[in-house]
Amino acid sequence: MNYSCLQIVCGLAFLFCLASPVTCAVTPLWVQPAAPGDELSGVVISDNGSAIVAGGDQLIALSREGGKCWTAWSGSLLATSRDGRYILMAKGPVVRLISGSGTLLWEKTLDTIITDLSIAPDASAIAVSGGGQIHTFTLSGGSIASDRSLAINHIKIMPSGEQILITTSKNVQVSDLTLLPVWSDNSSTQDFVEITPGGSSIVTATNSRVRMYTANGNLSWEQRLTGGKALALAYASDGSTIVVGMDDTTVQVLAHNGTLLWTANATNWITSVAVSDGGNTIVAGSRDKKVHVFNHAGTRLGIFTVKGPIDPHSVAVTRDGSLIVIVDQTAVYGLSRSSFMPQETVMATIPTPSREMTAFPTMKATRKITPRIMTLPTPPPTETPQASLPSPVPVIAVGLLLLCRFRKT
């Protein structure tokens, strides 16, 4: 009789194990540590996936297999040409252009701290901004133009290499490389910005508002997101998927037409996001050292925990979604998407309320502006809530215990 009770108790324990959620460790393909005493910040992958560069106190150039190609200089802001043959970097007031093999091509020191930079896909033009200034250069480092009247948030050189997109505290505008305006929308503050490789569509994210423009400055649609404010923006190279990281710990994903596809919860502020073509791999890094990976449907594929908080521009993914690269202060991590297995659907698909998204037939823009550098105050520590038992488990447990008691009598 006692033996039978022991069998029942063992069976109960087995059911507990089956019903409890299992967290599978994700093993990186490779890990490249920072040099002793150095800290890393930021990572960039070239459009063709041939160049991977991590920034910080010392740049580390890596192959897709994680091999160290070279190390040199320092740079907290990074950008590459489409083919990875040119790497633009900046730290403090210094901007450098280096070749994909690590050779210094030129270096310039400005009289302000650089807060953003951009390089044309074919490397034909370069732009840097900071402290109310913007400067444009040729590939050889020759000065094209400068302007000290714009309080700039972010800049992107258009894919043609002939124009530059600028967001400020008062507008979004496109100028030529001599900084003469081509078009502008002065209706409101504009912040984060991304462009498709073909340059046909432009996406901006400011606070809780996401907008899409055509290359000619026509406003296609506006979507108001619920919850917090945008801290990060990613736009798939094929134009299919838009990802916004928010300060309310959510990741919000939109389709090309502005429809909100889904919202997922993380556990802290989302400070860096990346998305592959088709949105099949979506990566979101948060301040609590966690990196969340989702598919296009909003299913959480897994969570990878690093040693330090995820800073802006610290997660990246190849266009095909097969390789994910993450940087914290201590190391660069390369992960295969195939190492993440579906675990749960984070939140149900959320239909877009018609009152939230506004589609605009055609609106031409016409320009000005105060510096704002985004700072991230340290959020309070969060605790990971313990998962409750699935509903059938308590019923099974009670039944087995009653059976055990009955057999004892």
Where are these regions (language model features)?
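Hydrophobic core register within WD40 beta-propeller blades
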Residues: V43, L78-T80, L117, I155, ...
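A cross-kingdom C-terminal cell-surface attachment/processing module
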Residues: S391-R407
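Blade-level signature of beta-propeller repeat domains, shared across WD40, Kelch, NHL, RCC1
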Residues: F304-A348
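Residue-level detector of Asp-centered blade-edge/turn motifs that repeat once per structural unit
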Residues: I45-N48, R82-D83, P121-D122, P159-S160, ...
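Hydrophobic beta-strand positions that form the internal "hydrophobic ladder"
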Residues: A51-I52, I87, I126, I164, ...
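C-terminal low-complexity, Ser/Thr- and acidic/Pro-rich disordered "stalk" regions positioned immediately N-terminal
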Residues: S339-P385
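A short beta-strand motif characteristic of beta-propeller blades
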Residues: P28-A34, G67-A72, T103-K108, G142-R148, ...
